[in-house]
Curated annotation (Swiss-Prot):
[8Fe-7S] cluster binds at C21, C46, C104, S145. Its EC number is 1.18.6.1. Tetramer of two alpha and two beta chains. Forms complex with the iron protein (nitrogenase component 2). The keyword Cytoplasm does not apply. This is Nitrogenase molybdenum-iron protein beta chain. One of its GO terms (molecular function) is metal ion binding. It comes from Methanococcus maripaludis (strain DSM 14266 / JCM 13030 / NBRC 101832 / S2 / LL). The keyword S-adenosyl-L-methionine does not apply.
Length: 462
């Protein structure tokens, strides 16, 4: 009888963490709004660290403003910084949406962020006029960095955006809200591709595909401000209250669907990322259920191509190989199920998040695959390192942060998740959907071939 063995962290210290702080998730979410600008209410390092991480992973600049709190703010508060910061952004960039993202310092100080925003709106109206000021929406996003992680920050941001901007109307718009989670531009494009094949118009909450992978073209605007192409328009964010339903593709992003369901009686579904055959099938069925649209031959063809690719390589190269997976709780569960579909053994799955969905979903994977799985629950890469020294595997799947561990242990690493900074092009290649599954089949198999098949074996492969 297969079972899930949950291993919790015994020590207090965190060594080589898998997660980072809440504001990153909020900044990511706001960056997916067309003409949206995150304003970090904290020190300069709070924004610099995230911009640096985004630049390494996405190979794109990120426009993130900061109120630049210093030591005096710890005594006197950050009122002046936030009010002047909002005013400067409004005057110079004229954004459609400004997301005020709190941090450790502003939360510990106890700044009245809501009150400061009200004052800032009055000041902006005085300088720009009532009409211009009313066009700029300000969203307060509380993300205390000293608790939780970037996934909670993302969840808080999406809920704040929906609660602040959604405007109900008398009629449904026939659209479907999709919360993608913290994924890559290639993944979001794949989501839009699948919806398009089914004739479904989606509202992405939010769409970071173009903002983090934009074309390099001369600006059509003759003057500043210049914004990256794309993002979810403000009109769509306001219209999300009138959609047919909400699907969250990340089990940690459940607050916004619950809020929409409670306020507007809108059906919702929170699930794992649609990675692999079973999870993508589930996503397609949910879309069909909410919209009534049929599954097209094009989608079935894409599914068939993946299954054909799996049949080509699974039994020959992958069957029975043990895998260690670490990272995002939603992606790791999806990857665990997919490697099991390939005939591999998800020996250990590690996440830095204490998320009960993670444990419950992994129990299902263990039962389906009929394999025992060790779950490092709320752990770090040091715990995974210690585990793998005693329980060796054939393949590691996770972010670039595990590259040195993989090298020391002599285990090949297939890079998935955030951040990936020692390979190029990863952010453009989906791992979601059937096309994403095809990329994973090829990538995982080639990684195995690089390590375990020597030149003397090549003739046997011909």
């Amino acid at each position: 009888m297969s079972e899930l063995n949950v291993i919790k962290k015994e020590r207090t210290a965190v060594i080589n963490p898998i997660v980072t702080c809440q504001p990153l998730g909020a900044m990511y979410a706001v960056s997916g709004i067309e003409r949206g600008m995150p304003l970090v209410h904290g020190s300069q390092g709070c924004s610099t660290f995230v911009r640096y991480g985004f630049a390494r992973h996405f190979r794109e600049p990120a426009d993130i403003a900061v109120t630049s709190l210093h030591e005096d703010a710890a005594v006197f508060g950050g009122r002046k910084n936030l009010i002047s910061g909002l005013g400067n952004l409004a005057a110079r960039f004229k954004p459609d949406v400004m997301g005020v993202v709190t941090t450790c310092s502003s939360e510990i100080i106890g700044d009245d962020v809501a009150g400061f925003i009200k004052t800032a709106k009055v000041e902006i109206a005085k300088k720009m006029g009532e009409e211009a000021a009313n066009k700029i929406k300000i969203v307060q996003i509380n993300t205390p960095s000293f608790v939780e992680h970037q996934f909670k920050g993302y969840d808080n941001a999406i809920k704040a955006i929906v609660d602040t901007l959604a405007e109900p109307k008398d009629e449904e718009n026939g659209k479907l809200n999709i919360i993608p989670g913290i994924v890559n531009p290639g993944d979001i494009r794949e989501i839009k591709h699948m919806l398009s094949l089914m004739g479904v118009e989606g509202i992405l909450l939010t769409d970071t595909s173009d903002p983090f992978d934009s074309p390099l073209r001369p600006s059509k605007a003759d003057k500043n401000p210049y914004y990256q192409k794309g993002g979810t328009p403000l009109a769509d964010l306001q219209d999300c209250a009138n959609s047919l339903g909400t699907i969250s593709l990340a089990n940690y992003a459940n607050s916004a669907p619950a809020s929409l369901e409670k306020k507007y009686n809108m059906p919702s579904k929170v699930s794992e990322a649609p990675i692999g055959i079973q999870n993508t099938d589930s996503f397609i069925r949910t879309v069909k259920k909410f919209t009534g649209n049929d599954v097209t031959d094009e989608i079935l063809d894409e599914r068939g191509i993946v299954i054909d690719a799996m049949a080509d390589v699974a039994s020959r190269y992958l069957f029975g190989r043990k895998v260690a997976i670490y990272g995002d709780p939603s992606i790791t569960v999806g990857m665990a199920r997919f490697v099991a579909e390939l005939g591999m053994i998800p020996k250990v799955v590690c996440t830095g998040v204490k998320n009960e969905y993670f444990v419950n979903d992994l129990k299902k994977v263990a039962k389906e695959s009929d394999e025992d799985i060790d779950a490092l629950f709320g752990q770090d890469l040091r715990a995974l390192d210690v585990y793998l020294k005693e329980n060796p595997v054939d393949l590691m799947i996770g972010s670039s942060d595990g590259r040195l561990m993989a090298k020391d242990l002599g285990i090949p690493l297939y890079r998935v998740g955030y951040p990936v900074y020692d390979r190029v092009g990863y952010q453009r290649r989906p791992i979601i959907g059937y096309n994403g599954a095809l990329n994973l089949v090829d990538g995982i198999t080639n990684t195995i071939l690089d390590k375990y098949y020597e030149t003397q074996d090549w003739k046997l492969q011909q």
